[in-house]
Amino acid sequence: MSNCELTVLKPAEVKLSPRDREGIINPMYDCQPAGAQYAGIGIKDCIPLVHGGQGCTMFVRLLFAQHFKENFDVASTSLHEESAVFGGAKRVEEGVLVLARRYPNLRVIPIITTCSTEVIGDDIEGSIRVCNRALEAEFPDRKIYLAPVHTPSFKGSHVTGYAECVKSVFKTITDAHGKGQPSGKLNVFPGWVNPGDVVLLKHYFKEMDVEANIYMDTEDFDSPMLPNKSIETHGRTTVEDIADSANALATLSLARYEGNTTGELLQKTFAVPNALVNTPYGIKNTDDMLRKIAEVTGKEIPESLVRERGIALDALADLAHMFFANKKVAIFGHPDLVLGLAQFCIEV
C-alpha cells in the first residue's frame, strides 16, 4: 500500500472559474483533403482515394457520417513511416487495383494528396500513368478515370480543396471525351451546399422548364428510408453528366470560390460561356440568379416563382422588423455562404 494521503475537498473549497463563450464554438474549418473528399462522394460510382495517413480519411468520414447520418465510401493508402521515407507511389498503385477489383461498378477515383505526400514529393501524375497501364491490362473492358488532386493541408482549406477536386475530375473526364453535339443544358455549380439546397435549385429549374446538370448532385445525402435503400450513399452526378458539361449551353457558377474555377476551365477549353452570380440566399441573390437563367435560356420567369417570391416578401414584412430591427450580426462560414447571408441580413 502507498503512504500517499488523499485530500478530499469540501464543496465550499472548490472554486470554479466561469467562462463566457460567445459566438460559434469549434467552427468547422477543415483541411483541403476534407473538401476534396466531399466533392468526390458527390459523384456516382466514385470512391476518393486519399494518399496519406489513415487519419486523413477516418476523421473526415466521421464528420460526414455525423452530419448526414449516412455511410460514405472513402479509401486510404494508409501511409506509414516507411513510405514517408522511401516514397508512397507503390501504395497508390496497390490501392487503385484493390478498389477496381472490389468494386465492379467503380468509374472514377480522385487521388487526393495530403501534407505528407506533398512534402515527400510523390509523383501522382506518374503513378496515374502506371495505374492506367495496369488497369488496361487487367480490365480491358472497363474505363476508370483517375484524377490527380493536389491538396496539401498546410495551405488553403476545405473550400479550396473542394474546388480543386471538382476542377481536376472535370478536366480528366472532359479531356477524354472532348466536345460533342450541343446539349442545350445548363451547367450549375452551387459549391459546397447541403442536400436541401440542391432540391430547391432543382425546383427552380423545373418551374422555369430548363434542363440543367447540377454538380455535384448531393440530393441523396438526405435520402428517405426506402425498402431498396443502399447501405452506402453516393451522389447522383454521373460520368456522362460530367462529360456532357463540355456541350452545355452555358455554365452558371453560384459559388465564386467553390465552383467558378471549373466554370472558367470549361469556358477556356470548350467555349462554354460562364456566368458568375452569388449563391441564391435571400431575395436579391435569388432574383439575380433567376434573371440570369432567363437571360441565358430565353425562358420567362413563371408566375409560380413570382408568387413564391411574394410569399417570402410578405413574411419578411410581417415579422422581420420585430426580431431583427437595430440588431448586429456576426457571420462566419464559407466565403460564398457569408456573401449570401450578408446580403440577406441587409434585406431584413
UniProtKB/Swiss-Prot annotation:
InterPro entries: ChlB/BchB/BchZ (IPR050152), Nase/OxRdtase_comp1 (IPR000510), Nase_comp1_CS (IPR000318). GO terms for molecular function: ATP binding; iron-sulfur cluster binding; metal ion binding; nitrogenase activity. Its cofactor is [8Fe-7S] cluster. Keywords: ATP-binding, Iron, Iron-sulfur, Metal-binding, Nitrogen fixation, Nucleotide-binding, Oxidoreductase. It is an enzyme of class 1 (oxidoreductase). [8Fe-7S] cluster binds at residues 31, 56, 115, 153. GO terms for biological process: nitrogen fixation. Its EC number is 1.18.6.1. Binds 1 [8Fe-7S] cluster per heterodimer. It comes from the Bacteria. Belongs to the NifD/NifK/NifE/NifN family. This is Nitrogenase vanadium-iron protein beta chain. It comes from Azorhizophilus paspali (Azotobacter paspali). The lineage of its organism: Bacteria, Pseudomonadati, Pseudomonadota, Gammaproteobacteria, Pseudomonadales.
